[in-house]
Amino acid sequence: MKVGFDHKKYLEEQSKYILERVNNFDKLYLEFGGKLMGDLHAKRVLPGFDENAKIKVLQHMKEKVEVVICVYAGDIERNKIRGDFGITYDMEVLRLIDDLRGYELDVNSVVITRFEGQPATTVFINKLERRGIKVYKHYPTKGYPSDVETIVSDEGYGANEYIETTKPIVVVTAPGPNSGKLGTCLSQLYHENKRGNVVGYSKFETFPVWNVPVKHPLNIAYEAATVDLKDVNMIDSFHLETYGEMSVNYNRDLELFPVLKKIIEKITGKESIFQSPTDMGVNRVGFGIIDDEVIRKASIEEIIRRYFKTACEYKKGQVDKGAYDRMKMIMEELNLKPEDRNVVLPARNYSNKLKESADKNDTCPVVALELEDGTILTGKGSDLMNGTAAVVLNAIKHLANISDDMHLISPVILEPIINLKTKTLASRNVSLSCQEVLTALSICAVTNPTAQFAMEKLALLKGCQAHSTTILNRDDEQTFRKLGIDVTCDPEYPSQNLYYS
């Protein structure tokens, strides 16, 4: 993999800049946008970026940091899913707490935002409190967003519970967007100022990158990742007017800035130190870029991946037509085609070839996988195993120089697994999944050195690209994610079945 980003340089620059910002205050409330850990988007568009870079920045100064996690009550109520992990937001909060503790960071509390007594949220609050987690309840802010007098009063932010904090940097994070992080920070600013404390607010958001051109593929990839939120990159007009410098921000921050500035000035009783949304940020990711061409190429590849993701989400009814149309416009703007992704045509061509001799209704699912050296392998779905399992076996055989006709998994192992699945557990989906096949392979590896040698090649699949001619089920998606394979799918279901697919 060609590296375009210097992780070490970024870590030093980012830590230093946050500490400089906190020096102006007794306490800094730092709103963390995007993902605190496992930022796979940043890792893909910035080759060399550590997916856990942001939490490592905090770990550098852990003695000065405590974390508050926000979650919107409505997201818990409707079981909102974090797409990349396939878990609900309430479970993501628990995972986040465990991970933060793993990095030796203090988790202060969980804040339930816009709480209106929702039953499922109340159950979640009880669960947290009975595990010893402090929970605060914040309510819909009266007068928000335009009535500043009411917002900055005992009826507005004053109605929220004050979060007791002890460290100079309070990181406010969340499982996903629109969770109430900004509202929580401003509510705390209100309460802290009433107590006579000198506190500040800043925002740590990786994308868009403020010191990279607005039409750079890196920033366009951010638009592609947020088509459902209707985020649009724009020149920060406030920054340009004040400093005469070009800077990039997104529409929501620019639209909100005048009101936000008024709220901060009303809370503090003095003129804001921020003259633009860019001023509010502490993001230094742009200074870690060391090879612009590598970043451009990686970002373009990400945009095509996002096109397939949006197309599949539209097929599943998870996004509206507007989001899908915006995604197509982004592709057209950069003169990109889905087929520009190397693994797409090999998968489709093999599937079409299989269809020539198959039943009319057979979708002939195929998965293609590109290895680091550019070799593209394919795997087809069968009665024995699905396409994801087949292509992974073919890939590790190729990497281990094992003959294609040699069986890695003994029928003695496979038959009991298939019988368990079909007869004992009465599953209608007979084909073994990728994880089931890898489990069978690991059992064979105990007595078969060839299987063991092939298994050792699984680590080489990290960073590989794959494409499926049909939508993968969640289990196979997650297995590919754990293997580090970036997979896209054509927006077609593998069968006519609505549930058993």
UniProtKB/Swiss-Prot annotation:
It comes from the Bacteria. Signal peptide: none annotated. Coiled coil: none annotated. Transmembrane segments: none annotated. InterPro entries: DUF1846 (IPR014999), DUF1846_C (IPR048441), DUF1846_N (IPR048496). Pfam families: DUF1846, DUF1846_C. HAMAP family: UPF0371 (MF_01567). Belongs to the UPF0371 family. This is UPF0371 protein CD630_08980. The lineage of its organism: Bacteria, Bacillati, Bacillota, Clostridia, Peptostreptococcales.
